[in-house]
Amino acid sequence: FWSYKLKTEQLIGSNIKKVFNFYATPKNLNLITPPFLNFKILGNDYEETEEGRIFIYRLRLHNLPVFWKSKIEQWNPPLKFVDKQLFGPYLKWHHHHIFEDLGKETKVIDIVYYTVPFGSLFHKLFVKKDLINIFNYRKESLNNIFNS
């Protein structure tokens, strides 16, 4: 199995409390997820996130239906939270959301540790490109929401 790390950073023109609260509201994930994924949160319609909370999503990857179950493993508002995939397309997925207080701005750092099935060629041909596109869309969406 092949393990990888993806890291992105973004400066958002809003204070850390507002930015963290945006991330802590599950329905906002729909606003920063590309439409091509047909992303939908299933089950409980939580207003906010907390440690131990489990979320189930449905999406489409390359036109294939995918179910994803994740758990909030760490919750340290307004500085950090970590979600872990319990079931889904990856063999392993740990997503660290880190927020740095810069006064009137916030630096958002995403670090994802993940393991893919089917080896490095599958990662190179599909997964890496998909993740870059997804996180680029997220950056653009966050810019439109906070920096407009």
Predicted regions and their residues:
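Short, surface-exposed coil-to-beta transition loops
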Residues: 5-7, 65-69, 92-95
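A short, structured loop/turn motif at beta-sheet edges
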Residues: 15-16, 48, 73-79, 98-107
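Glycine-rich portal/gate segments that line the openings of hydrophobic small-molecule binding cavities
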Residues: 40-87, 140-145
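A non-catalytic, amphipathic alpha-helix used as a structural packing/dimerization or gating element
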Residues: 133-141
